[in-house]
Design a protein with these regions (language model features):
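Alpha-helical bundle regulatory/interaction domains
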Residues: 1-127
């Protein structure tokens, strides 16, 4: 799937997004993977307005691996420069593997120490 704007308030302003089904071996833990890539003109910002979504996401970014908790309100992410993210929409069964206190993740984004995952994804995304 490509260009699926579900969860984004203004999909026409969204950078290219690839949405891929989870492979069978991880489908009990991941609903799908999402990969946006952007290249914003210097000095410009692309604000991505997001709807609340009651699920956790694991996201690998160029500088970190993060775990986003379920959201209870609209939010946004400002994109600048060139970048990418490889994200996974997690099923509830995956969350206890990543945190001991899922409730504390509500409306939060926390960094995770997963250097091997970060290295593998960064290598795949940057060649």
């Amino acid at each position: 799937m490509t260009g699926d704007g579900r969860g984004v308030l203004y999909p026409a302003a969204m950078p290219p997004l690839h949405r891929l089904p989870a492979p069978e071996r991880v489908s009990s833990l991941v609903r799908w993977f999402w990969i946006p890539e952007w290249n914003i003109v210097p000095g410009r910002v692309s604000r991505q307005e997001l709807l609340a979504f009651p699920a956790c996401h694991l996201a690998v970014e160029p500088t970190l691996v993060g775990l986003a908790g379920p959201t209870t309100r609209r939010s946004h992410r400002d994109l600048t420069g060139r970048g990418w993210t490889v994200g996974a929409l997690l099923r509830p069964a995956a969350v206890p593997h990543l945190t001991t206190d899922p409730y504390a993740l509500r409306d939060r984004y926390q960094s995770l120490a997963l250097p091997d995952l970060h290295r593998a994804v960064t290598t795949a995304m940057t060649g």
